[in-house]
């Protein structure tokens, strides 16, 4: 099912983050929760989870999946709009991005996440979507995202979803896991900003 994360994706997230969270109290922002299956895993791994979705109904479902975990905060909002100012005043160590898969939206989500200086780790779902791949590739080329690795189904280059095209989608995994790189060559984000010209 392309609409939710696979067990392998969730296992790879846990394997990556558990060693870090064993010695530190880390916070993750999950952007796009759908039914909350990944949210439940993140709640078991992280000290604090901030789950954001534009659909209130998805947040209600996610709340049921997490069985009322006290370490999960649910927020309704459009992650593409620059409402990350609230996050900038908090310590967020990791971001899981699985919201709107259009190129411009993923670009905005990554830019907004990079504006939170404490974010060191990025996980992306639906890497098979062209907009997701293109946006991540641009940040990798700039050096803003480094040490990226494939996670979830297809991490080994195997076919894993209906519609998989062996000629154009070799080595396309379900997700991608990256670390923050040097940001010296990143231009500021002007997505969803208002300008007045006089």
Regions found by a protein language model. Give the residues of each.
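A short alpha-helical cap/connector motif
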Residues: 1-96, 100-198
